[in-house]
Amino acid sequence: MQDVVQAYYGKELQSTADLKTSACCDADAVPDWLKPLLARVHPEVSSRYYGCGLVCPPLLEGCRVLDLGSGSGRDVYLLSQLVGASGEVVGVDMTPEQLAVAREYLPFHAEQFGYANVRFLEGQIERLEELDLEPGSFDVIVSNCVLNLSTDKPAVLRGIQRLLKPGGEFYFSDVYVDRRLPEAVQSHPVLYGECLGGALYWNDFLRMARGAAFTDPRLVSDRPLEITEPQLAALVGEARFYSATYRLFNIPELEDACEDH
């Protein structure tokens, strides 16, 4: 399915107008404090944004942040402003066409912000150990509607846990579903590219997160998704999809429930 994803995001989609569902459209209201920062991101970068939520947690100044599946770089350039000149943001993506857009506007954003604190790496999020990324070196790792596109989600979570500093967090938005999906939906190229075919069944995700030592997943927000194209809606049947934002903390000694000893 990686070839399908690369082709869909590298060649099929040229802007958000080409999307066929609301899964990869950010319907979350942009908070007022973030609007001026978003306005400083180049329009060409923003037009190729396919996220499903906001992955800009507060209090990032001076932090080292990694964005998995960074695409055209919109979130990277937002985060660049939040971490400031003393921080760093690294984007990882496997799609050359998306990376080309992100890298083309590196000089533009460095001039806009008054500093250069961003770099982009080409690679697969399931194989982060192959990239020039030091274990235990990131304060925060983010991703936006990306984990569902992976064919080996446990490997992604293990790689994230390996790269986070003790006490660091994985702050991410993704697509979830209220049941396990049949093979016909999982393997459908458009549904997969639209972030639905690989959507995480809620309970499978929670088990997966705990298996990667993220013992207490915290839900930040969620919203239902709409499938307006009749043929696609018929394929998914009664399944209900949601965009949700979670926080996973790298605290190995953390218990899996709130306790009062």
What are the residue ranges of the model-derived segments?
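Short alpha-helix
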Residues: G198-A213, L219
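Class I SAM-dependent methyltransferase SAM/SAH-binding core
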Residues: L60, R64-L68, V76-L128
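Short, glycine-/aromatic-enriched active-site segment of Class I SAM-dependent methyltransferases
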Residues: Y176-L196
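Conserved alpha-helix/loop element of class I SAM-dependent methyltransferases that forms part
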Residues: D28-R64, L78, L82
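A short acidic, Gly/Pro-enriched loop at the edge of an enzyme's catalytic core
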Residues: E129-V140
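A short SAM/SAH-binding and catalytic strip from SAM-dependent methyltransferases
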Residues: D139-D152
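C-terminal lobe and adjacent flexible extensions of AdoMet/dcAdoMet transferase-like proteins
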Residues: A212, R218-P224, E229-H261
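A short glycine-rich, Lys/Arg-flanked "PGG" loop and its adjoining helix->strand segment in the class I
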Residues: P154-E169
